[in-house]
Amino acid sequence: MPQPSKLLPARPSRGGVPAEHSLHPLPPVGRTFVAGFESTLHPAAGVDALDLSGHERQVGHDLDRLGDTGVRHLRYPLRWHRIEFAPGEFDWAETDRVMAELQARDAVPIVDLVHHTSYPAWLSDGFRDPRFGRALVRYAEAVAARYPWLPAYTLLNEPFATLFLAGHEALWPPYDRGIEGLRRLLLSVLPSLVDAAACWRELLPDARHVWIDTAEHHSGTGPGAEHARVANDRRHVVLDLVTGQGLDRRRPFLGRLTADGGEALLELPTLRVDVLGLDYYCHSEWFYDEAGSHAPSPRPVGLAAVAGQYADRYGLPLMLTETNLRGLPTDRVSWLRYTLEQYEIALARGVPLHGFCWFPHVDSTDWDSLLARCAGRADPVGVLELVPSGDRRRTVFTAAWEQAAAGLPAADLPAYRFQSPCDVQLAGLMPSLAHWAWTDPPPSQSVPAVPVELPAGDTPEHDDWSAR
């Protein structure tokens, strides 16, 4: 573990509190609602989605609105690129101000140290930069020393998804491609995550390490069945590598990943995860057949089954740390009802879920292009709608979310018929929602229906959780 940095103050300044300050516990098993604010640095433009949403200008106002709902737990970003402007030189002024706003409202944050590609510009080669590992550990140590009251933390948001998009799919910097590119980034990043986790365990032993990543499920028929088998192995490799879980090189994806120079990945020291955060969207489930790949899957097993798989595999406390739906407010109401219903089913089956997070609380920007375009284009996914002026607007979804956060069961939420394009994307869900009493959306939010044709193929077998 690295030694304490000489650059750190001897005691916390305005942003910190005495180390003996009592930590708020994370929520118990149940349906506690958790909020979240989106902060991702656009890879090409150097613009932060948090700024485009206007949150930086109205932190207090956003937190007051959230506090009015009774929701105290939230995922909250710390912006490395706005803290360490040069190697080893930290400017805490902005972060101290925001942390004080959280403390003043008795909020319980899960701080997000790095959200996707949100690292400083001086790391010119991003995750592949030879300075990245030491820099991440230095930054993580500095945060832990300055804010010893923090109750929970995420070191890197969605490490598998982030490094897969940056290292395998060439969508984000450093634009590597293929299994060789992914292997390169994992060798660069995972050792530093292990070291940073050890650092936090030493400095803040009572803080909870919340590991957050995509919660996927892959199924298929015919030639697609083998692809699904590989993808189902792939979804687990990053967490397995840092926890030492099932590292059998006969596994279809793990074996390829840890060959040809990747053997060191099997020898990483392990880190401890206290809570496993599941990010589940309609596109988290994929289906493969003769025609290719389909996401969202036309044969989804559902959130309850997917959460059960992760519970069985890792034996950890779980949280639903992200879900949303890009669509009209009425579409989001129905997706909230669906995911909350599935969450309640999982709880009834004994899945240890500790929180339900619709993410983000305010519309984000430019995710319709996976951040390839930085146009400030509002992404209609939030609890509060982002309008061109930067203000927030309440919608029918805002009211539904607030009712659910106050304890309203999923069955008592409205069931609005999905509108285009959500009706096409979510057609595979409809058999599992036959018990709903559907309602037409208000005329002001109606759009023409679009016919959908599902791919041919037999329904894939579901795992045991889907039948419990």
Task: Identify the role of each PLM range.
Residues 4-29, 99-100, 104, 108-330, ...:
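Active-site region of glycoside hydrolase catalytic domains
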Residues 40-42, 79-83:
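Short active-site-proximal "capping" loops at secondary-structure junctions
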